[in-house]
C-alpha cells in the first residue's frame, strides 16, 4: 500500500493518529448491561444517536476508510472496555499496516499480567491504557507494577495513563453514574514507574487534562514520557493563567520538543463530524 500524505502548511506529511477509541460491539454490549431499559447494544446506540457496529472487522473497515478520507496513514486503536483485546486484535489482523492497539486494563481484575502476556502474543496489542481514577487504584499499587514489568519484556511497548479530569459524555447522555476518584489522577504518580522502566514508553493523553504543569514536570524528568493532544481540550478553563491552546502547544514544545508530543484526535464513534 502506498504511503498516505496529508497536505499541511509545512508541506506533505505522513500523519499518524495516536488516540482513536475503538467502540466495538463488546463496548456497546457492556453499556447495555448497565442500561436495562435500552435492552441491548442496538438500543444503546439508538439512545446515543450513533451507528451500531456489526462486528470488529466491519468497524475496522470503516475506520480504515476514515483514515483514507483524511489522508491519515496509521492509527492507535484503544479498546475502551477492560480486556477487549479480541476486538482490536481483529482490526490489526485485517489491517496490520494501518492499526496498532492498546487496551483498557484494570489491574484489580484477576490475573491482569497473564492477560497482558496473552494479549501481546495472540492479539498483537502494543500495550495498555490505564484509568486509575475510573477503577480506583494508585499507580503505586504492586499490581500496576506487575503490568509494567510485563511490558518491559517486550520491545516498543507502551502504556497510556489517563490523568486529570475524566468526563465521559456518553455515560452522561445515557444517565449512567461516573463514580470516579480524582485522587488517583495526578501525573506525578507516574514518575517512579517511568524512571524505573526506561524501556517502556508512557503516554499522558489530553496534555494531562488539567494537570499540564505536573505532566510537563514528569515528562521533563523522564525521556520515555510523552504527551498527546487529544480531546476538545476543555480542561484549559482550569489554567490559572490565561493561556490560549496555541500557548499550550508552544509551552509543551519548548519543554519536550516535537518528537514527544503526539497528535491524537480522540475520535470514537460514527457518524463522524468534520
Residue ranges and their predicted role:
Residues 1-146, 150, 213, 230:
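Mid-domain alpha/beta scaffold segments of enzyme catalytic cores
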Residues 14, 98, 224-225, 268:
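Residue-level preference for alpha-helix termini and adjacent loops
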Residues 16-20, 96, 246, 260, ...:
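Generic intrinsically disordered, low-complexity segments enriched for polar/acidic and small residues
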Residues 23-25, 82-84, 108-111, 165-169, ...:
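Active-site environment of divalent metal-dependent phosphoester hydrolases
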Residues 55-59, 111-112, 240-244, 257, ...:
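Alpha-helix capping and helix-coil boundary motifs
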Residues 126-127, 140-262:
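Catalytic pocket-lining loop regions of alpha/beta-barrel enzymes
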Residues 258-274:
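His/Asp/Glu-enriched, well-ordered alpha-helical/loop segment
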Amino acid at each position: 500500500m502506498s504511503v498516505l500524505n496529508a497536505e499541511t502548511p509545512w508541506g506533505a506529511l505522513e500523519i499518524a493518529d495516536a488516540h482513536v477509541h475503538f467502540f466495538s460491539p463488546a463496548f456497546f454490549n457492556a453499556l447495555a448491561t448497565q442500561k436495562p431499559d435500552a435492552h441491548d447494544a442496538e438500543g444503546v446506540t439508538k439512545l446515543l444517536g450513533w451507528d451500531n457496529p456489526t462486528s470488529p472487522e466491519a468497524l475496522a473497515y470503516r475506520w480504515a476508510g476514515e483514515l483514507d478520507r483524511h489522508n491519515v496513514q496509521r492509527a492507535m486503536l484503544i479498546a475502551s472496555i477492560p480486556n477487549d483485546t479480541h476486538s482490536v486484535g481483529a482490526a490489526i489482523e485485517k489491517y496490520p499496516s494501518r492499526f496498532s492497539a492498546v487496551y483498557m486494563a484494570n489491574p484489580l481484575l484477576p490475573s491482569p499480567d497473564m492477560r497482558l502476556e496473552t494479549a501481546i502474543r495472540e492479539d498483537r496489542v502494543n500495550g495498555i491504557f490505564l484509568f486509575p481514577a475510573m477503577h480506583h487504584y494508585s499507580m503505586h499499587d504492586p499490581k500496576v507494577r506487575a503490568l509494567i514489568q510485563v511490558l518491559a519484556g517486550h520491545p516498543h511497548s507502551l502504556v497510556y495513563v489517563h490523568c486529570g479530569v475524566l468526563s465521559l459524555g456518553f455515560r452522561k447522555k445515557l444517565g449512567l453514574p461516573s463514580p470516579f476518584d480524582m485522587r488517583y489522577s495526578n501525573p506525578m504518580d507516574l514518575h517512579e514507574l517511568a524512571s524505573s522502566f526506561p524501556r517502556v514508553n508512557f503516554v499522558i493523553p489530553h496534555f494531562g487534562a488539567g494537570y499540564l504543569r505536573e505532566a510537563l514536570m514528569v515528562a521533563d524528568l523522564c525521556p520515555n514520557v510523552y504527551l498527546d493532544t487529544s480531546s476538545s481540550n476543555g480542561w484549559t478553563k482550569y489554567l490559572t493563567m490565561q493561556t490560549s491552546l496555541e500557548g499550550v502547544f508552544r509551552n509543551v514544545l519548548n519543554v519536550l520538543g516535537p518528537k514527544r508530543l503526539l497528535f491524537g484526535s480522540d475520535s470514537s464513534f460514527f457518524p463522524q463530524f468534520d
